[in-house]
């Protein structure tokens, strides 16, 4: 089996690829998500690690990897159920990766956006990539209660939106 070099606290640990994917999916998303979501995360995570030549660290700069002990601690009595579910996602996507023009893509992912994604070069020091372009993701606003959105209005725009030309901005707290 292929091994992934995972740097944790300046120590390099060599982990079987499937075991690594199990730990990454456990660390990157809730195991109670639907199987198809877990499978998508497996494919993204597998692609990510191949893009990095099977050498990563255990931080958000790479992918968060949980050990067996950490999974047992986090999942408690759900450990066997969640372990089996993620293992199934790994098995069902065996060898599936994402490529662009024959190369592994930079499979960057996040839990949710604020209604749209970012161009890769606007967020990372990177050249533009045709597959990492900003797109609308308005559904994120409804599925993630932690999302907030800030919008700026002129005083006149607010008066028009509230249909109140007498609105006194000096008393708005």
Regions found by a protein language model. Give the residues of each.
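Conserved, single-site charged/polar hotspot
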Residues: 1-173
